[in-house]
Structures are given as structure tokens and as C-alpha cells.
């Protein structure tokens, strides 16, 4: 919890529908404007805070106590947070964990992220659940506590629809990734050797999480990360064995030029997409995108493998989904491989001829369960078999064939 050595800093969260929640501020002093959402994960707040997929959003944690284990550099998913604000019931200033290097309030203050605590987060989550996404204004600035003005500002703020948020989070130039998954301090936990031979992989950075890159490296890929606007010609010049489409924030329809590049590359290279990358692949294959009422954000989403009937508990973080009917009508031989059991939205797709597949959820988790990490092994298998001259399809691999 936050110490009370000084008077609490007044803060409020005002929504576009006129609802106002009053609490106290911590972290950065300022104003955050964005789309309000909630995450149901009990742990992993640091990974959530540093996930670039949250650009343009105000994130509410449904679990009551946040910050207990502090913050450490190993668990960061990006160099800095990209979210607009953070909402919790009760933050902790004095963490207790041997890996902690900084408290949550200090971390948020360092990056200037405004946060509010002491509000009824259950009531807020119910409002989002019942009424859907809407904009909000979170102010921890003592000089800006005009709630009526905050409501008007929330109403006039642009929605996420149509905004190219990927342009705000992608890397500025290509780089090599060569860090493995974390295996304890000084690597004292056992590690399997990287598979051989290695394969050259170009990974599009739409807001990529570090744990995805770690797991791709661990599967024997020599990973070159490239900016989102990299052309198909530039990718071909790198002579990759495969292409990866990463996660990222916002509306996939708004990401400039990428759909056309992916459509070009999809006919030439094995391709795997996660989250936003899955949606962009769906667009490239002729599908359409629809916005969900309040999205899927959390580490406890049920994803069903249609071929086997098995259900994996998955980490998800998205407000948009590929429309199943549009995908079926697009004319491409595409298989819907996975669905979300809560609302039957598309969670996976694969091509029945070409080596292409993707998943909406996060097999790398971070945070979340590891039920779906096998997709990284399947991706490597698809690349290896295609490299050996076998005409294996994405559907064969995604469905375990």
C-alpha cells in the first residue's frame, strides 16, 4: 500500500458517459487520455504495463492488490510502457520479492505514467463489461481536477478505430535479437540446447513483446526484427527462411501498407502471426475485422482446438477480432483452427495450401499459462519441412499433422 507520510494526491477518472471515479494518484503526475479496458490477470502486472499492445489505453486491473512483488528488468516486455494510465484498487509501495529492483509507484513515476487507486474497480469493470469500450481521462495533476472538463475531453478524444498506433511503437531500424528466455539469475536453471540447424527469420515489429523473441530464438531462429513499414522487397533482400508477424496495439485496419506487404510475402515464405499479426494475416487473406464489446484481456481465456477438442487456458490481449463469416467468404482455402469458448470468436486460422498459420492469443504468455507454447515448435517444424522440400501447409501444422 502507499504510505501516508504526505497528504494523498487527489485524482479522478472521468468516462465519456459522464461517470466519474474519485481516488488518489500515484506514479506520474499528469493526465492520461485513452480507451478504458480491464485485465483479469492476478499476476504479471509488469509484463502488462510494458506490453506495447496497450498503447492508447487506460488499463484497469481487476485483482485488488497490485505491486506486491515490485518491478525488475528481466520481466519487461519493452523498453518502456506505452499505456496512457493505470487503474488499481490498492497499490503496494514496499514490495517483497528477491528479484525486485523498484516499487511499482516508483516505476510509474519514472516513466511519467499517471495511476489512480482507491476507487471501486469492481464497479468500473462492470460498467466496461455492460457498456463496452469508451474513452476516459485519468488525472493525477493537482492543477487539473475539473471533472466536467475531463468528461468533455473524454468525449472529444479520438477512438482507437482508425488510429495507426503501430507507428508509435514499432522500432525505427532493424536489429538482431539473440537473447534466450530467462532461466534464473546467471542461468542456473537448466536449459535445453537450441535446435539445429538454425533458420533465418524476419520478425515484423508491430509492438513485439520480448518474450516472443526469446522463444523464437530458443527454437533455433536467427531473428532479425524489422520496422512495421518494411517492404516485401526489403524482406526478400534479407533472404529469410520464414516471416513472423508480431502482436501490437489498436486497429489492424489502420496499419498503413502492411496488409499488402503480407499478402505479397505470404505466397513465398512460411509465416506465423500472433495477436495483431494474426489479424493482419486475416486481412491479407481477404477477411474483415470487427471490434469486440470489451475485448479479451487476461491470462484465463479458454481457447479450443477445433480439430482435437482440447481446450487451452490462454493469455489474450485484444479488442478486435477476425470476422469468421468474412474469412469463409473470401475465397481462400483457410481453416478456422481455434475459437474462444466464451464468445466463439476466431482464435486461430491456417491456410490449407500455403505454409501460413496464426493465433489470436499469446502462446508466449508473459504473463499467463504455458499451455500453448507448442506453437513455436510447430512453426519451426513447418519451416524445417518446407526447407526440406515438403509441401506442408499451415493447416497441417497448426492442427498437429
Each language-model region and where it sits:
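RNA-binding accessory domains that recognize and position tRNA/RNA substrates
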Residues: 1-233, 237-238, 252, 330, ...
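Residue-level detector of beta-strand face positions
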Residues: 12-13, 302-304, 348
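Residues that mark the start of a beta-strand
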Residues: 198-202, 222, 270, 313, ...
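Active-site-proximal beta-strand elements of phosphoester/diester hydrolases
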Residues: 200-204, 314-315, 357-361
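Catalytic beta-strand/loop cores that center a nucleophilic Ser/Cys/Thr
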Residues: 310-354, 397-401
